[in-house]
């Protein structure tokens, strides 16, 4: 069971990152991976349901870090759910609801997609102590944490840059009455 959880977590990470670059993987693969991501999220929640139920039941009694992690996990779930719903609605390969030209849905999908990745990195950061539990060398552990922080900051800055410089924003403002 533990190995399955780790495999699911790794797949969630890889697919989330792969979904970011639609130009590289194409629309069809983006939609297929989005569906796979939704399925993996459901499996991830089911595999961790006992823990989720326990923390929910004892929320007031849990420590601050667990409360923060729990709130972030709920936020991640809401963000991913919004991303997936918008993605399905604007899809034009696997599904076709003829809404792919809905600028509001496209922008919501883009924003939530980036927020999903950022919150995923926060989630991973809060779990790094569990991930590196077996690492005995403190200097190596500290170096990994520092590298992780720089990677997260770099990716976050890149996502903000690409979001603010993407063609969707230009299109939105060109066609608005503002």
List the model feature ranges, each with a label.
Residues 1-178:
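Membrane-embedded alpha-helical bundles that constitute the cytochrome b-like, heme-associated redox core
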């Amino acid at each position: 069971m533990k190995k399955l959880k780790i495999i699911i977590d790794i797949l969630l990470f890889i697919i989330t990152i792969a979904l970011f670059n639609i130009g590289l993987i194409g629309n069809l693969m983006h939609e297929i991976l989005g569906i796979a991501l939704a399925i993996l999220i459901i499996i991830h929640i089911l595999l961790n349901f006992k823990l989720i139920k326990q923390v929910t039941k004892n929320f007031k009694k849990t420590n601050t870090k667990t409360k923060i992690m729990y709130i972030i996990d709920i936020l991640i779930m809401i963000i991913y759910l919004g991303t997936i719903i918008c993605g399905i609605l604007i899809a034009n390969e696997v599904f076709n609801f003829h809404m792919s030209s809905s600028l509001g849905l496209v922008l919501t999908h883009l924003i939530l997609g980036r927020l999903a990745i950022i919150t995923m990195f926060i989630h991973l950061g809060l779990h790094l102590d569990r991930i590196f539990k077996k690492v005995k060398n403190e200097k190596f552990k500290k170096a990994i944490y520092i590298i992780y922080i720089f990677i997260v900051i770099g990716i976050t800055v890149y996502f903000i840059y690409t979001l603010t410089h993407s063609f969707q924003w230009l299109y939105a403002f060109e066609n608005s009455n503002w």
